[in-house]
Amino acid sequence: PYIYHDYPSDEDLYWLFRVGAQLESRALSSAILLQNPLHGDLWHRKIKRRASEGLQLLEDNWERLPEFWNIVCDVLETRHQTKPVHSAEEIKLLHDRLPAHVKLFTVANERDEIITGAVLFVTRQTVHVQYMEAGEEARTRRALDWLIQKLIAHYEQRGMRYFEFGISTERGGLYLNEGLAYQKEGFGGRGVCYDSYLLDLQQATEAME
């Protein structure tokens, strides 16, 4: 998507059109333009001080990854009957190889228990949320909202251009999780499409001759 471009570069889309590629699916993500954010209802809604008191934000505390990953696996299994694409070991390996581009943020409560967190993939101008889940206590205390606000402010201050939440669609874009999309919009996120094309290589070769 264009939010990962340093400069206008839609020549690939034009080429796909010229060689007869067919749009096969369109997923919808949400991103915030950090240089001119549209802070929505969830941004302006105050998080109760009592609920957020005692929360601690931890950055790149990788020894706590297994605790957060247990939350990720539990939420995905319970709510969506699925599993994360990566294992905790794979995420750690990605960080070891690309430490500046794979970041871990976790939130601990007063008992030093991890209750929510996020794994982010960071490019030169865009921060992408790869995994972000919250346990029961975090949902009760709205700790995930608190974390999102902290992350947006963190990367806005560092001059990043976009903060991307990830897709809110399933089945190749045919189903939109409206509640999830609404939540992202509440923080100022707006739509970014992820397109997939089907290309007949023989047809494309003939079109280029």
Regions found by a protein language model. Give the residues of each.
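A conserved beta-strand-loop-helix scaffold within acyl/acetyltransferase catalytic domains
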Residues: 1-138, 154, 170
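Aromatic (often tryptophan-rich) hydrophobic motifs at membrane interfaces
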Residues: 101-208
